[in-house]
Amino acid sequence: MIIYPAVDIKDGRCVRLVQGEFDKVTVYSDNPVEMGLKWERMGAQYLHVVDLDGARTGQIQNTPIISEMAVKLGIPVQLGGGIRTVETIETLLCKGIHRVILGTSAVKNPELVKQALKTFEDSVVIGIDAKDGMVAIEGWAKTSEFTAIGFAKKMEELGAKTIIYTDISRDGMLAGPNLKAMEEMVKAVNIEVIASGGVRNIDDIRNLKNVGVSGVIVGKALYTGDLDLKEAIEVAK
């Protein structure tokens, strides 16, 4: 199981939101690249980066920082937030981003998913953000008509190999992950499930490992010091 430290970028800074609310922001660093390098030094095998401005506007906004990250970090970076076209995917992969995450665009534009998976294969990951079991879109501002599990199965049929499953109600709350929802998702699909949202301590890492997810994205708990990255990586092995 891989631990993915999360670096969320807003206005060029490394921040954390509570439940995706843009007015509930805590700034942790003015230098997201340095933050990524810090997690790498502590043993991270992979970095999870989100362009929050991009998620909100539908277009990548923090390109210079993201490009610098891809160049300076020795570990792979997966990026989400505002990726809505095949051209954007191609540009990001050319800049050295290892994997891109399609969220809102996967819901609104299944043709894009089909084309992206066909062209870029494993370099495309599907982000499924759920609110009460329903898929949420556009920076979590709206709920779609899809159930999270139904949508995951649809993405698997289209050829997706990995999904990132976020429980919005838990995100940034340090309330513990929704283990039941994660377990249901793992059992429902035959592809890799990366869990996101609510991780607060080492016990949550152990519990998620038992559920059978292939990876865990950790944000706030690393920044508050409630979770030690080295210990989390050790437990995840």
From Swiss-Prot:
Cellular component, GO annotation: cytoplasm
Pfam families reported for this sequence: His_biosynth
The keyword GTP-binding belongs to this UniProt entry's keyword annotation: no
Highest taxon above the source species: Bacteria
MF term (GO), any: 1-(5-phosphoribosyl)-5-[(5-phosphoribosylamino)methylideneamino]imidazole-4-carboxamide isomerase activity
Keyword Signal tagged: no
EC number: 5.3.1.16
Xref: SUPFAM superfamilies: Ribulose-phoshate binding barrel
Compartments, as annotated in UniProt: Cytoplasm
Catalytic activity reported: 1-(5-phospho-beta-D-ribosyl)-5-[(5-phospho-beta-D-ribosylamino)methylideneamino]imidazole-4-carboxamide = 5-[(5-phospho-1-deoxy-D-ribulos-1-ylimino)methylamino]-1-(5-phospho-beta-D-ribosyl)imidazole-4-carboxamide
Active site per the UniProt annotation: D8 (proton acceptor), D129 (proton donor)
NCBIfam families linked: 1-(5-phosphoribosyl)-5-[(5-phosphoribosylamino)methylideneamino]imidazole-4-carboxamide isomerase, PRK13585.1
Family recorded in the similarity comment: Belongs to the HisA/HisF family.
Protein name: 1-(5-phosphoribosyl)-5-[(5-phosphoribosylamino)methylideneamino] imidazole-4-carboxamide isomerase
Origin species: Acetivibrio thermocellus (strain ATCC 27405 / DSM 1237 / JCM 9322 / NBRC 103400 / NCIMB 10682 / NRRL B-4536 / VPI 7372)
